[in-house]
Structure formats: C-alpha cells, structure tokens
C-alpha cells in the first residue's frame, strides 16, 4: 500500500501488543497519529484507547489502517472485517520500511537468522559504523526507522514477511528451509512462499543470497530479474565454503576462517552467506576478514554453559525444531559419551531424521515436557534403557546428581559421570528441538533456567 505523507490525526488500529505492537504504538504517537490498541491483555497503563481483541469488529471505532503484530493469526475476525471494509492491513516492518531512508539487509530462514543477522552487522561495523540491527531479533524496526543511519540489518520471520507488502530491500538473505511453523502456514509451499517475500524478485538492482538448495528450487520454478547469489560447499557457489582448507572463496577475496569461533558446518555456511551480504552492500573484504575471528555468537545458541574437570555443558535452548538440533549435532564428537537433553512442545515434524541420528550411538537421551507423549515410544525403540523420561529440567538434573563420578585414567583430574553400568557421560548437550511454551515464556527463559541448574550442579563437584 501507499502510506500517506503524514500520519498526523489518522486513527490507526494496532492489533496485538507485544514487542513489535508496542513499538508501533510508540512510533504512531510520536508521529501524532491517533492509535488504538487491540490485544488479549489490557496493559496496566496505556495512553491510547484499548479494546479486547475478541470485541465484535463492528464495535471498534472507524480506522484508516490496521497494523498487525506477527503473532496474530491471519484468520482473526478483525482482519476479515478489515478486508471486507477494504481497510489496509500492514506489518510493523512495513511501517518502519516506509519511513527508513537508508540501505537494508534482510535475513530469513528456518534456523540461524539471529546469529546471521548479528554476524552481518558485526562484519560491517567498520564499513558502516552507524548501522543498527533489529527486526525479529528483538529490536523493533519502528524504534529506529526515522534515525539518520546508513544501514539497517533486519532479521525477518515468516510471520513478519507474510504480513508485509513488498519491502524492496537492498540485499536479502534466505538461509535455509526446514519443517517449522506448519501449525500457522499449513504446508511447506506456503511456508516457502512466505519466506520468499523477503526477495525483490523483479528488481535488477536487488541481490538475493540463498543456499544452494534454495537456488536450485528458484531456478527450476520461479521467474526473477534480481541478482541471485548462492553460498555452500560446491565450488561453483558464489561463496564457496572449503571445509578442508577452512577458506571461504568469493569473486572478491579468499577469506581465512580457521579462527572463526562458532563450531559446525552450519555456522560456517551462515558465515559464507554473511560475507556475501557484507560484500554486496559495500563492505571492504580486508575489514570483513579482520572481524571474522572476533565474533562470539549469541546466547542460547550452542553456548558453552559450563566446564569443569573435563565435564562440559552446552546450552542450545534456541534449538526449537529438529533441523536446528541436528545441524548443531552434525559434527559433535564423542557421541557415545554425550547426554542429549530433548523436550518441550514438539512441532509437526518427521521424526525419522532424529531416529537416524540416535542410531549413531548416543550416550543417552533425557526427554522432558510435552514431547514425552509423542516421542517416547519411538526413541525408546532405538536406544532402550538409554532413555530417561522426566517432567522438567529440575528432574533432569536430579538424574545427573545421582550419577557416580569416576576419574578418567591418565587424564589429570578429569572425570566422567556414570549414570548406570553402561552409560558414562562427559558432555551434556541441551538442544531441545522443541518450542519452549509448555513450561516457559520463551527460549531465553528456558536457557537461563538451564544455565542456573548447570552452575548449581558444577558447584557441587569437588575440584
């Protein structure tokens, strides 16, 4: 849609509060609009009119525009009413895009969006010192869209993209696609098309960066005029990841990634995508190379939660689907001495990849939360007595506390934790592969709880 030159005096409905909705409200107030908030929960204090979101749409004041928060389902009655009345519905990202005057890099994909968003911003900090990162990462676009900055790096979820008009970004990155959010999108094709809205396909000045697999899909079925670049492990990729030499090769530079901090092929592929995006927007290769070893990643993403006497704990609470968990574990060593902690609210996913991974010989699995109802029998059929089922994370650590501690022969003071006669563990990986909402507000709260339990557990181990 075409936004009016000024929002002053316009009555605008913000459907859904939360981080993006509240940011949109604040922006509209600053622009002297007359916003109205419609949400499930009434805020304790608000300076704008409030209506519950289950109000009959006909009872709402007449408005010129609806701004939809990403968590609101497309089937919401107010949205149907708006469509009937031909009232435009836009996203918070749409609103910010209209008012932002700088360049934009957008990042989407099933997994790795947040890390890649922060990584691109990190690589470009010398070339664009005033840049800002945000979007689905937690900093709403409308909180800084009118600032005079040269570059915004935005994480964009499928929900945000589904709700948005064409965003006309300068560079778009589509990292990967795996089964997720099908309770919302219903089919993988719908999910793919929502993600693909990040691309300005008909604009020859736009650059779209994709994985090799997504490039193949686009070449086979989609018409485009934009610049299409790929990253991956084949030599004809525009950013070729050479795992043997630990180099990433583009047409402009050969990058040494031997000192890149984040482990795993999936993180190195995200780095390849990030390098392409940084080059395309005008980043200097020498500056990008200098900054590669300095990036330390984000919390709750295969983060070292604690180490002591050879025992290690990994916090990967951001793993909310099987694709993410399996990517992280793909290059994990000493699988037979690893305890994998799974659980939460499972998504609509094929469990065969999980079973194939477990067949490799996992040390043990602890399964907690709602996932027990649908995952227990299949996992038990593969690993038998190596499966522990518990209610929650507190119970998980009670299992660990009951284990016996034994020294590892010939390795100084290193120890191993024996949970049974046949199960000895040196690494505990919390990569739930499920949503957190059965027991937590979000993956951050879940990850922080895990970190506190790790600290308590390690404090009880004598040095």
Curated annotation (Swiss-Prot):
Its EC number is 6.3.2.9. Its main location: cytoplasm. It is found in: Cytoplasm. ATP binds at residues 109-115. It comes from the Bacteria. InterPro entries: Mur-like_cat_sf, Mur_ligase_C_dom_sf, Mur_ligase_cen, MurD. GO terms for biological process: cell division; cell wall organization; peptidoglycan biosynthetic process; regulation of cell shape. SUPFAM superfamilies: MurCD N-terminal domain, MurD-like peptide ligases, catalytic domain, MurD-like peptide ligases, peptide-binding domain. This is UDP-N-acetylmuramoylalanine--D-glutamate ligase. It comes from Leptospira interrogans serogroup Icterohaemorrhagiae serovar Lai (strain 56601).
